[in-house]
């Protein structure tokens, strides 16, 4: 099939790579978000998907308004049989959705109807889910509600961060997307409506929401920190400094009041609503992440300081 691939960040790359290599499909263009400012100088930088497409001499479309009449007309001229979507980053109008005969097929990183929205991987970890996965479905105007073509499951490991889990889902999801498109091309796949029960939503997590709440149980603190690692990144205020935190580990140790700090020779504990947690890495402002015990020694941290 003639395909237009819509995607923007790194998790979309395995899918685009597989479709470029597929003997059954031709990626005639890539649709991605406009270049964004990056680096200290804020220079406009192409998205990871744009860079991969350019490396393969595939035309890159970066419309600031993808639902405009001009872009709808441009897409019609490309005459795609189908559009494949992986983390494109914009809602699509009904006029745009109607252009390809086989519609727009989205790869979503959850087992729909669970965790519809922008942050399904983070939501699954924060909720303590044991299993998640990826789903291919036909895009409809309502958010992540379209009929399903296929699913693949993935176990959530005890220490998974959102970044680690997303990396695995991006790979397994790429296989699923390719097989879904193969099945559509063959006429052997029929989409199945999502069940009405079991719908949960996963809106984008803000920086404010990534602040650690030490008044929660240790296992919840652990999950919530892993859910926002690496982005947007967990943080807390210790003394007068706002620091980013890597994953933590609940400790079977003497309890501490929520936010209270215990500095040991080779560890730093912070109190929660239950047992304390041991800090892993700490990143002070303007510095690289470092071992929490090394940071505490350098900062001359003591029990008079707490995490807020």
UniProtKB/Swiss-Prot annotation:
Keyword presence, ATP-binding: no
Residues where (6S)-5,6,7,8-tetrahydrofolate binds: 110-113
Domain of life of the source: Bacteria
A GO term from the CC aspect: cytosol
Keyword Protein biosynthesis attached: yes
Enzyme nomenclature, EC number: 2.1.2.9
Any Pfam family matching the protein: Formyl_trans_N
Record keywords, A-Z: Protein biosynthesis, Transferase
Reactions catalysed, as given in the entry: L-methionyl-tRNA(fMet) + (6R)-10-formyltetrahydrofolate = N-formyl-L-methionyl-tRNA(fMet) + (6S)-5,6,7,8-tetrahydrofolate + H(+)
InterPro entries reported for this sequence: Fmt (IPR005794), Formyl_trans_C (IPR005793), Formyl_transf_N (IPR002376), Formyl_transf_N_sf (IPR036477), Formyl_transferase-like_C_sf (IPR011034), Met-tRNA-FMT_C (IPR044135), Met-tRNA-FMT_N (IPR041711)
Gene Ontology terms, MF aspect: methionyl-tRNA formyltransferase activity
Function: Attaches a formyl group to the free amino group of methionyl-tRNA(fMet). The formyl group appears to play a dual role in the initiator identity of N-formylmethionyl-tRNA by promoting its recognition by IF2 and preventing the misappropriation of this tRNA by the elongation apparatus.
Family to which this protein belongs: Belongs to the Fmt family.
Name of the molecule in the record: Methionyl-tRNA formyltransferase
Lineage of producing organism: Bacteria, Bacillati, Actinomycetota, Actinomycetes, Mycobacteriales
Gene transcribed to yield this protein: fmt
């Amino acid at each position: 099939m003639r395909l237009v691939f819509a995607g923007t960040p790194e998790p979309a790359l395995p899918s685009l790579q597989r479709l470029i290599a597929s003997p059954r499909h031709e990626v005639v263009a890539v649709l991605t978000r406009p270049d964004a400012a990056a680096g200290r100088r804020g220079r406009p930088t192409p998205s990871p998907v744009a860079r991969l497409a350019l490396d393969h001499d595939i035309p890159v479309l970066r419309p600031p308004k993808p639902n405009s009449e001009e872009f709808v007309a441009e897409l019609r001229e490309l005459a795609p049989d189908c559009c494949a979507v992986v983390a494109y980053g914009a809602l699509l109008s009904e006029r745009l959705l109607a252009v390809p005969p086989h519609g727009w097929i989205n790869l979503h990183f959850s087992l729909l109807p669970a965790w519809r929205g922008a942050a399904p991987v983070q939501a699954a970890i924060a909720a303590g889910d044991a299993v998640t996965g990826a789903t291919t479905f036909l895009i409809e105007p309502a958010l992540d509600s379209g009929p399903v073509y296929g699913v693949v499951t993935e176990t959530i490991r005890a220490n998974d961060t959102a970044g680690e889990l997303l990396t695995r889902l991006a790979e397994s999801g790429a296989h699923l997307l390719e097989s879904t498109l193969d099945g559509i091309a063959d006429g052997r796949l029929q989409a199945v409506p999502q069940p009405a029960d079991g719908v949960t939503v996963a809106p984008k997590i803000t920086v404010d929401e990534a602040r650690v709440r030490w008044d929660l149980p240790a296992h919840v603190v652990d999950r919530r920190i892993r859910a926002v690692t690496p982005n947007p990144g967990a943080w807390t205020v210790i003394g007068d400094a706002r620091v980013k935190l890597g994953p933590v580990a609940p400790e079977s140790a003497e309890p501490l009041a929520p936010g209270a700090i215990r500095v040991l020779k080779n560890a730093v504990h912070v109190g929660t609503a239950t047992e304390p947690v041991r800090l892993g890495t700490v990143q002070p402002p303007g510095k690289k992440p470092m071992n929490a015990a090394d940071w505490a020694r350098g900062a001359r941290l003591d029990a008079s300081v707490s995490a807020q």
